[in-house]
UniProtKB/Swiss-Prot annotation:
This is Small ribosomal subunit protein uS11. Keywords: Ribonucleoprotein, Ribosomal protein, RNA-binding, rRNA-binding. GO terms for biological process: translation. It comes from the Bacteria.
Length: 129
């Protein structure tokens, strides 16, 4: 039998100096995606993709690790400055922003883009613990 040769596309090194870091922080996970100014994805990471499972995904430390991984991957493409767009009520918001600054990316602006309903669907009932 002939084995099929699998070809893997090489990652093209883009030369992008500024972009947007989208931090989506939920109660269960934190996702960090770094895009160029037009919105094309350059690098992304999440707490779950780094091996955190269950309730450990929702910790600030997991958000910090996800932000570091995404920042390092984007710096390979020449990223130097980012605007930060934070979405969601999760615990990893501030930790992810601090981690982006600690890796050497210059944060030029921080925006909160959490969607606020104009009385949309009914929210889930309050937890009684």
């Amino acid at each position: 039998m002939a084995t099929r040769k699998t070809t893997r596309r090489r990652r093209v090194k883009k030369n992008i100096e500024s972009g947007v870091a989208h931090i989506h922080s939920t109660f269960n996970n934190t996702l960090v995606m770094i895009t160029d100014m037009q919105g094309n994805a350059i690098a992304w990471s999440s707490a779950g993709s780094l091996g955190f499972k269950g309730s450990r995904k929702s910790t600030p430390f997991a958000a910090q690790m996800a932000a570091e991984a995404a920042a390092k991957a984007s710096m390979e493409h020449g990223m130097k400055t980012v605007e930060v767009a934070v979405k969601g009520p999760g615990s990893g918001r501030e930790a992810a922003i601090r981690a982006l600054q600690a890796t050497g990316l210059e944060v030029s602006a921080i925006r909160d883009v959490t969607p606020v309903p104009h009385n949309g669907s009914r929210p889930p009932k309050r937890r009684r613990v």
